[in-house]
Design a protein with these regions (language model features):
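Alpha-helix C-terminal capping segments
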Residues: 51-57, 84-95
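Short beta-strand segments
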Residues: 6, 65-68, 98-100, 139-143, ...
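Short glycine-rich anion-binding loops that position phosphate/pyrophosphate groups of nucleotides
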Residues: 10, 43-44, 68-71, 145, ...
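A cross-family phosphate/adenosyl-ligand binding-site feature
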Residues: 3-53, 58-59
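Glycine/threonine-rich flexible loop motifs
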Residues: 71-80
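Electrostatically charged, flexible surface regions
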Residues: 111-240
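Glycine-rich phosphate/pyrophosphate-binding loops
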Residues: 90-115
Length: 240
């Protein structure tokens, strides 16, 4: 059985949200094909938490987030509401996957959701059968092409995203400034073995992402630092 609990609006670039400052609303809706679903005014990660905490009456076996209409590659995973919803599932100990379509200026005329759905339908049973390591999710990016045009699967690492953000300053009718973060669409380095490289080669990219963000290679170096005595300033600031 597939149960749907999703945001009622766009949460692009929302990151990992946990709404604690206001109540969350959930309402029954119908999808375009008549499928019953639940919609919430919370973020994608809120929706996963709501489902796990009891909005859905049955135990949850697996979390699927997406299909996002833009790729989530490289550093995008820290911004993405789609990926962080899967992260929320992994926090709860559930096998979790995020699916995104690689729409860009060259292929944005048609969104091939049917391709991404076919990819998800093939991958989800494999995750159910094989499982995932604890606190690991799969970030899946699919070329925005017909299924017949895809060259296959590629297990990848996160690539290097290149952002082209710029500050756009405007003034309201009262002369007060306001700002947009604008700029051109991000690009990336299509290096071999990366999610960006896989998409450039028309492969489905499957990237295991872990919740542990510790930079283990930096630990020994940091342990060699001579950290100052935390009490030295306090003692020197006391009057005689």
């Amino acid at each position: 059985k597939v149960s749907v609990l999703a945001p009622d609006r766009n949460w692009s670039a929302s990151g990992h949200v946990k709404t604690l400052h206001r109540p969350l609303r959930v309402k029954e809706v119908q999808l375009a094909d008549g499928t019953p679903a639940l919609a919430s005014d919370g973020a994608p990660s809120d929706c996963v938490a709501l489902a796990v905490l009891g909005i859905l009456p049955e135990p949850i076996d697996l979390v699927v987030s997406g299909i996002n209409p833009n790729a989530n590659v490289g550093h995008d995973v820290t911004y993405s509401g789609t990926v962080t919803a899967a992260m929320e599932g992994a926090i709860w100990g559930l096998p979790s996957l995020a699916f995104s379509l690689d729409r860009n200026e060259e292929n944005n005329h048609t969104l091939h959701y049917e391709t991404a759905a076919a990819v998800a339908a093939r991958l989800v049973p494999m995750v159910i059968q094989n499982g995932l390591p604890p606190h690991v999710l799969l970030n899946v990016n699919i070329p925005n092409q017909p299924l017949s045009a895809l060259r296959g699967w590629m297990v990848t690492r996160l690539g290097l995203r290149i952002y082209r953000d710029e500050l756009i300053r405007r003034e309201d009718p009262r002369g007060k400034p306001y700002y947009w973060i604008g700029g051109d669409e991000p690009t990336g380095l299509p290096e071999e073995g990366t999610d960006i490289g896989a998409l450039a080669g028309n492969y489905v990219s499957v990237t295991p992402v872990q919740l542990d963000l510790t930079a283990y290679q930096a630990l020994d170096g940091l342990r060699g630092w001579q950290f100052p005595d935390l009490n030295s300033h306090k003692e020197s600031s006391n009057p005689p």
